[in-house]
């Protein structure tokens, strides 16, 4: 892990597919999403692309972020890429086990859990309740 950052003017949400609903981000003025940033090799990136279903399910977007070093706390501007689910995918309700996994990550990085809660509330409001 290189460090953590915040993607400004983006919001967090759960969008779906036939296999479930997963996290993604979308432009949203005034919002922000905390993120962890990893150093990846070309081989790592290729493996991540396959895992994330890129470019069919998610696509990659380049961003320049201010990253707070995990060891030093020093802020450095770096070019990064993020995976974003294609916009035509519908809002969906995630499984409880997926939300727990995401929450574990949020806790381990010290992120405010309200970002996940808000995304989950939006999913329930827009997609309806799970049967």
Regions flagged by a language model, labelled:
Residues 1-131:
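Glycine-aromatic micro-motifs
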